[in-house]
């Protein structure tokens, strides 16, 4: 019996040694250009980035806020595999001999006030709400150029219209004005955020009403100057957009599209500094807006007795005027939302709090916030 067991053990060892190595399955990032194999994403959500730079002496990859030194092979290709990443979209850059560049293997995105590379770590079925589906009617994303008297310049708005817009020609629609964050632009929500898929899917499921969504660059696509106040109404960053929004953008949208123009049919939401802008615009203009969404909203230093003309002192007025006030953020970010909600609680201002579990100050948080917000707005 001992000899038999020994033979079996040797045979098993031989089979094990002959078996192929179980390499983690890898897939190309969906944002790769057609000819690029890398970046690759493995089953542990790690990204492998590779670039040919035979004359470089030092190459690094900066992914999701972390810097990774890259290793050179004999052919002059540099590569690195990141730590496991949160599912969803991530900006990244390459640093080649101290020059920050984009990866030619991916499409480019406007983030950090410059062009950036991007990769998408696949989510499971729980991410189907931001994916396109063949059995769902799809709306359109339009780019609309208009002249702003306030800024004395030509500007561009990105506008989503629901699938039924061009066939239901007698119907008018409520409008959501949706702002991006600091260092991004009006394309962010449709590219990084995939808002058109979220809208299509939520409308098709009956969880959201058909609506028009308007996105504009908001004058926060340039870096914010250090040393200036971040507090509400004190910071000059992005303030130039406020008269554009109120005096030019809204009238242009109401003239160009079949909109409902009453305050109950107009909402504004934004992510990060776009949330700061949304609060700055909506609270002093409750005669024009009835819905407000702050997605990781950068609302700092709120003084309910002073800011927004003191409107927050009258809790009954605000709670009546705002049909829905949404505040959402991720569990892994420190944007100051707890301090904001504490201030609002003390003032008696009602709001609905949403938490994105396991996510930080990133696009997956804001995709989730948008999905949650639109299932309540205009309803």
Residue ranges with predicted function:
Residues 27-29, 35, 41-67, 72-379:
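Non-catalytic cap/lid and distal C-terminal segments of serine-dependent acyl enzymes
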């Amino acid at each position: 019996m001992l000899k038999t067991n020994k033979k079996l053990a040797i045979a098993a060892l031989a089979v094990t040694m002959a078996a192929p190595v179980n390499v983690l399955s890898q897939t190309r990032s969906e944002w790769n250009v057609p000819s690029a194999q890398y970046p690759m994403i493995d089953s542990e959500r790690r990204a492998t980035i590779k670039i040919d730079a035979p004359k470089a002496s030092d190459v690094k990859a900066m992914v999701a806020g972390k810097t990774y030194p890259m290793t050179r092979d004999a052919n002059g290709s540099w590569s690195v595999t990141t730590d496991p990443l949160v599912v969803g979209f991530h900006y990244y850059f390459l640093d080649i001999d101290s020059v920050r560049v984009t990866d030619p293997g991916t499409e480019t995105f406007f983030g950090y006030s410059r062009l950036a590379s991007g990769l998408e770590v696949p989510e499971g079925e729980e991410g189907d709400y931001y994916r396109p589906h063949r059995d769902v009617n799809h709306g359109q994303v339009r780019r609309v150029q208009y002249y702003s008297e306030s800024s004395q310049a030509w500007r561009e708005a990105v506008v989503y219209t629901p699938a039924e817009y061009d066939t239901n020609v007698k119907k008018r629609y409520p409008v959501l004005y949706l702002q991006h964050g600091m260092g991004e632009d009006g394309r962010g929500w449709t590219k990084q955020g995939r808002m058109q898929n979220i809208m299509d899917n939520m409308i098709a499921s009956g969880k959201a009403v058909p609506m028009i969504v308007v996105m504009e660059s908001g004058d926060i696509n340039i870096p914010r100057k250090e040393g200036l106040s971040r507090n509400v109404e004190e910071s000059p960053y992005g303030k130039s957009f406020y008269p554009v929004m109120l005096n030019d953008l809204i009238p242009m949208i109401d003239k160009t599209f079949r909109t409902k123009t009453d305050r109950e049919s107009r909402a504004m939401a934004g992510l990060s500094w776009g949330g700061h802008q949304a609060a700055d615009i909506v609270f002093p203009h409750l005669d024009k807006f009835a819905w407000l969404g702050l997605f990781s909203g950068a609302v700092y230093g709120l003084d309910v007795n002073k800011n927004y003309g003191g409107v927050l002192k009258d809790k009954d007025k605000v709670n009546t005027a705002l049909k829905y006030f949404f505040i959402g953020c991720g569990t892994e970010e420190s944007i100051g939302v707890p301090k904001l909600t504490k201030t609002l609680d003390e003032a008696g201002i009602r709001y609905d709090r949403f938490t994105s579990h396991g996510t930080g100050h990133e696009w997956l948080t804001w995709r989730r916030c948008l999905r949650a917000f639109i299932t309540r707005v205009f309803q």
